[in-house]
Regions:
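Short beta-edge strand/loop motif at the mouth of beta-sheet-based domains
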Residues: 8-9, 15, 19, 28-63, ...
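Vicinal oxygen chelate
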Residues: 58-62, 80-87
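A short, structured loop/turn motif at beta-sheet edges
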Residues: 17-18, 67-73, 96-105
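Conserved catalytic core of Hanks-type protein kinase domains
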Residues: 23-24, 69
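A conserved amphipathic terminal alpha-helix motif
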Residues: 112-165
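Hydrophobic/aromatic beta-strand elements that line small-molecule binding cavities or substrate pockets
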Residues: 11, 62-68, 91-98
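Beta-strand/loop substructures that line and gate deep hydrophobic ligand-binding cavities in soluble
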Residues: 82-128, 133-135
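Hydrophobic pocket/interface hotspot
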Residues: 20-21, 30, 49, 66, ...
Length: 165
């Protein structure tokens, strides 16, 4: 048993498991809903993956390894910054895709978070990305504003409110 935080998020998407799998693993599709990033890999067990900026800089803000890939049911990856020193090892993200009639239950479990601060970050990040993914799959368009912008605005307002000046 670990004292390290774990984040779990469940969403329901009107799509097939194959469509959800494709949206999680196709670089061009991830670029549509993942805010200026795409996910690059061949998605084979043991392969590397990168969360690459789409600005042409070639910078990967997150990297990891594919631990498990069972299309279209389950994808497990490690996740860390490219230069992070994490004594307990990288985070681990599991995507479980379960069909139910005309919908899919997508469960994202992010384990081995380094601390409560990382938990707060992923608690804002995953719901934003998954809301955009859901909207994209159901409508063919992403949300009109990036949900992560709301978090940044709330954080800035909170910092201004707590500023003793």
């Amino acid at each position: 048993m670990t004292d390290r935080p774990t984040f779990v998020y469940v969403t329901f998407i009107q799509a097939t498991p194959e469509q959800v799998w494709h949206a999680l693993t196709d670089a061009d599709v991830t670029a549509e809903y993942w805010a200026e990033h795409c996910n690059i890999s061949d998605w084979q067990v043991g392969s590397a993956w990168e969360h690459l900026r789409t600005d042409g800089s070639g910078i990967a803000d997150l990297v990891g390894t594919v631990l498990e890939a069972v299309p279209p049911k389950r994808l497990v990856i490690t996740r860390t910054g490219p230069n992070d020193e994490r004594p307990a090892g990288p985070g681990r993200v599991t995507f479980d895709i379960e069909p139910h009639g005309d919908i899919v239950r997508l469960t994202v479990t992010h384990e081995n978070l380094s601390d409560d601060a990382e938990y707060v970050l992923v608690s804002a990040g995953w719901p934003s990305v998954l809301a955009n993914l859901k909207t994209f799959l159901e409508t063919g368009r992403v949300l009109p504003q990036g949900p992560w912008e709301m978090y940044a605005e709330m954080r800035a307002a909170r910092m201004a409110f707590n500023d003793p000046k």
